[in-house]
């Protein structure tokens, strides 16, 4: 939490209060995204052209029976599938009853398996038994089938817990794909292999993959010119929408003077919008996206108040005030920065209420309760630091499961999603379903491993890594290895909750999956790309919010 012992503010109410010395770097973007000017006429023209091409694709391509697997894969990879959801669903239902024995080609069998599993069809991994030899190993002849290896590698990331054949497939393909990159740098698929070895499709943010794949698809001699044109136009159109949204949210941030009022907090508005863009990018979720971005911005400030600035007495008063959620509690907060924060928090949720229909308010109330929960978790961690308490691994998880913020963000992501979210959805969420639990634990472990170096530079509560080391008497390396094994297991558990019939609508499950993908991007490099904005995050933001695709 701080580089010095937290002091009781009641003893220092009329004196200078000793504050933590944690310093976060300022925004690297300045006012770059504050203004975005595009005429409505230009937007309408772009939309009309995209819509025109969509209708042509439906008529000329989707009605064809030619290579439906490849078509669905390309629509998804090019970022176009959201335009053709019903058509893709119909095709997948037809493909699901296609006998897999017809797929003797490794690439096609793997693609069939992956596409169906992605959409919740519980197809059996026994389809890959035919590619093994008499000794139970994958056939050596497959090593030269590079497209097949690549397709099997991607399919292996849709595995469930205990599916040994897919674990074997992952090990087999990883070994040989790495060898291709190392020994055949001129191989036409070498660059693509390097990318997916680092982050497979299952763990990749959809829009980032679309940006990458459009350039790959364009170089493919067999590409469909109509699909390529639509993909480019659609990507650039969505980028216009997103830049317009980011401009609105950046103005909200500026008008509230958050950076000035809370100079100790991370100023990461652009990074936060990118984060939420990874959760849902589709135009129909604009309202949900803007609301969630504002909530995550408020949560980031809250985290820094509890983790890098507030004294234990201040935090105790603030926690009580938040639990009551009553503007009259503001008078009990002694410090001006806390009064300002408290009013902004309550005012923001009042504004959110105005944006929702009366029959939608129960969703916001649920999300508000999650905000109270996370703040309770923040205070528990502050108390640990103040008392020098070292929790057990299990005790740490009980609190840090909440303070990770994952459940809060998932709940809040549902608020603006219109009719797809119902009372039943929130009832499902309240029972801590496997996909949410797996995503949250995965996020907790990756966060703690990724932010470890930075946190060690200041006085901070023990992480799950520290607690695991102490509880089980192992080294840091061994603890990290074990937590990474758990991360792999949690990915498999996420896959399992997509199996049809799902308890909640598919878009709900996708939100949870997408939150997990963002965490993978932010923390996989072994650092915290959000706190200390690094190369990966900067390049990702530029790819989606700065650089358009040449037509």
From Swiss-Prot:
Binding-site list for (2E,6E)-farnesyl diphosphate: 266, 303, 307, 444, 447
Organism, as annotated: Cannabis sativa
UniProt xrefs under CDD domains: Terpene_cyclase_plant_C1 (cd00684)
Function (record text): Involved in sesquiterpene olefins biosynthesis, constituants of cannabinoids and terpenoids-rich resins. Catalyzes primarily the conversion of (2E)-farnesyl diphosphate to hedycaryol, which is spontaneously converted to elemol as a thermal degradation product.
Expressed in which tissues: Highly expressed in glandular trichomes.
Organism placement in taxonomy: Eukaryota, Viridiplantae, Streptophyta, Embryophyta, Tracheophyta
Residues that, per the record, bind Mg(2+) 3: 447, 451, 455
Chain ranges for the short sequence motif DDXXD motif as given in the UniProt record: 303-307
TM ranges: none
Cofactor(s) demanded: Mg(2+); Mn(2+)
EC number annotated for this UniProt entry: 4.2.3.174
Domain comment as written in the entry: The Asp-Asp-Xaa-Xaa-Asp/Glu (DDXXD/E) motif is important for the catalytic activity, presumably through binding to Mg(2+).
Protein name stated in the entry: Hedycaryol synthase TPS20CT
Catalytic activity: (2E,6E)-farnesyl diphosphate + H2O = (2E,6E)-hedycaryol + diphosphate
Gene: TPS20CT
Binding residues for Mg(2+) 2: 303, 307
GO biological process, any: diterpenoid biosynthetic process
